A protein has these predicted regions:
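Extended, low-polarity transmembrane helix blocks
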Residues: 1-44, 48-55, 59-70, 74, ...
Length: 148
């Protein structure tokens, strides 16, 4: 079985990287362009996101809202493709740490109470790519010849 695991490991790593990165995109589409309106959030464009961030104490919201949108809409696909994996993972990690603190403040641990359970799982996955890089099947490896 060792050979099977060795063969599958780079593919499963790439699949996890793609899932983690692409999971950010719908959030960016919702917060930036108003897609997926019936998903329980109050922000459906940059201005509403900025106002929400201000209300939640993350000031200035007009600074953070476009950065969050950029991270979700550009950083997510970059992580998915393994492009500048470690720097992008570091930026996403900062965002997710703040998200986890907010989720803990609002709902504790359990996701059905709006807690951090779900976002914590994504945070741990991002830490993996911060530490390990994009892997063999990444644009970093293809273009740079190494994991970045």
């Amino acid at each position: 079985m060792g050979q099977v695991y060795e063969t599958l490991a780079p593919w499963t790593e790439a699949l996890l990287r793609a899932a983690v990165g692409l999971a950010l995109v719908p959030h960016g589409l919702r917060n930036t362009f108003g897609f997926f309106r019936d998903t329980g959030v109050r922000a459906h464009n940059i201005a509403e996101l900025a106002a929400q961030l201000d209300r939640d104490g993350y000031r200035p919201g007009r600074l953070w809202a476009p950065l969050i949108s950029l991270l979700q809409l550009a950083g997510g696909p970059m992580l998915a493709l393994g492009l500048f994996t470690r720097p992008v993972a570091a930026a996403i990690l900062v965002f997710l740490i703040v998200t986890n603190v907010e989720r803990w403040r609002v709902g504790g641990y359990f996701w059905n109470q709006l807690g951090l359970e779900y976002t914590l799982m994504w945070t741990i996955a991002v830490v993996y790519f911060l530490v390990h890089g994009g892997g063999v099947y990444s644009l970093d490896h293809l273009w740079l010849g190494r994991e970045y």
